[in-house]
Amino acid sequence: MDEEYIALLDRAYKLVAPKAQRRAEIPKIEVQNMPRKTVIPNFGQIAKRLNRDIYFMAKFFQRELAVPGTVEGDVFTLHGEKSPKVVEAVYERFIRYYVVCPVCNSIDTELRREGRIYVMRCLACGASTPVKPL
């Protein structure tokens, strides 16, 4: 009975593991500097991939970088020059605070507002964690 169980468990892991690894890929952010502004052309695609509202992400970037910005379609424009390294650091901070599950480290999460607080619920392990409000 134990050998049969182990064989079934191995089979299940082989079927499930590749999907979980593929899901854990965090998209790269593209940063383009222009005179007096910084453009992120793949911002909407990142928001969809991370299952986050594009305006919520934009608000986080604006507050962290202390510059105004606009969202036009999938493109996010910051009205001020910021180096790509600084923008990437803010992106990593956003992922750490608002995307990655602190229990299982999965990015398969959703963010909901319950009253005055935001709650991040992991779709992989089911954990609910309150996060900092913006």
Swiss-Prot record:
Annotated coiled-coil segments of the chain: none
SUPFAM superfamilies: Translation initiation factor 2 beta, aIF2beta, N-terminal domain, Zinc-binding domain of translation initiation factor 2 beta
Keyword Protein biosynthesis appears in the UniProt entry: yes
Alphabetical list of InterPro entries matching this protein: IF2/IF5, TIF2_bsu_arc, Transl_init_fac_IF2/IF5_dom, Transl_init_fac_IF2/IF5_N, Transl_init_fac_IF2/IF5_Zn-bd
NCBIfam families recorded: PRK03988.1
Record-stated family: Belongs to the eIF-2-beta/eIF-5 family.
Oligomeric form and interacting partners: Heterotrimer composed of an alpha, a beta and a gamma chain.
PANTHER family in UniProt: EUKARYOTIC TRANSLATION INITIATION FACTOR, EUKARYOTIC TRANSLATION INITIATION FACTOR 2 SUBUNIT 2
Name of the protein: Translation initiation factor 2 subunit beta
Source organism of the structure: Pyrobaculum neutrophilum (strain DSM 2338 / JCM 9278 / NBRC 100436 / V24Sta)
Organism ancestry: Archaea, Thermoproteota, Thermoprotei, Thermoproteales, Thermoproteaceae
